[in-house]
Amino acid sequence: MQIEISAEKRELQGKGASRRLRGSGKVPGIIYGGENPAQPIELDHNNLYHQLKLEAFHASILTMSVEGQKEKVLLRDIQMHPFKPQVLHIDFQRVASNKKIHMKVPLHFINEDIAPGVKLAGGLVSHVLTELDVSCLPKDLPEFISVDVGELAAGNTIHLSNLQLPEGVEIPALMKGEDLPVATIAIPRGVAAEEAAGGVAAGDIPTSVQKKEGVAKEGEKKDAGKKK
């Protein structure tokens, strides 16, 4: 998904200038990194606010157009108002096509409804991670990574080493030997309690006990016959 952002160079800086800028419906921001100096910018608040709702905006290479000059950037930081739907400041980082980047990518969980642990055991899929830090060249950056839980049984766990990664994408945590859990299927307490209560069948009772009960019942039948 190609996303383009339009911005203008920001001449005035400082708290007062930023406050006036926000009052006029603009958002102060900055582009940094690479061989060029940092460039203060200003963006239209409404357009930016709607773009921020796109998942791909947070995990994709973006095309930044500053007064007609375009360059590739990544979203690096957003400052939001504590209780109003307002963007206070935004940071972008330039990217070079030949240098690896580190980026958090969202995880999309698929086939949850057909997982044996859900369909047969009544379990619930627990998302231990919802995003993943990856390393790759800009051209290889995925918008998301799919996690297939279609064969996951109750009590089992999917780890980082089980993920199917796009070509050219690496997981720094795995390279450090950290095979973190990604998703698991847990049995709710109510379901587990019902299974435990209903699990004591005749086959679960020791044979010696079953025999004693059988003898006792047979004796009761004979006594009843004599009384008649």
Swiss-Prot record:
Basic and acidic residues bias locations: 1-13, 210-228
Keyword Ribonucleoprotein: yes
Gene Ontology cellular component list: cytosolic large ribosomal subunit
GO biological process: translation
Keywords associated with the record: Ribonucleoprotein, Ribosomal protein, RNA-binding, rRNA-binding
Region (Disordered): 1-21, 198-228
CDD domains found in the cross-reference section: Ribosomal_L25_TL5_CTC
Keyword Flavoprotein: no
Pfam families: Ribosomal_L25p, Ribosomal_TL5_C
A single MF term (Gene Ontology): structural constituent of ribosome
InterPro entries linked: Rbsml_bL25/Gln-tRNA_synth_N, Ribosomal_bL25/Gln-tRNA_synth, Ribosomal_bL25_b-dom, Ribosomal_bL25_C, Ribosomal_bL25_long, Ribosomal_bL25_short, Ribosomal_L25_dom, Ribosomal_uL5_bac-type
Family designation: Belongs to the bacterial ribosomal protein bL25 family. CTC subfamily.
Subunit note: Part of the 50S ribosomal subunit; part of the 5S rRNA/L5/L18/L25 subcomplex. Contacts the 5S rRNA. Binds to the 5S rRNA independently of L5 and L18.
Functional summary from the UniProt entry: This is one of the proteins that binds to the 5S RNA in the ribosome where it forms part of the central protuberance.
Listed name of the protein: Large ribosomal subunit protein bL25
Native source species: Nitrosospira multiformis (strain ATCC 25196 / NCIMB 11849 / C 71)
The encoding gene: rplY
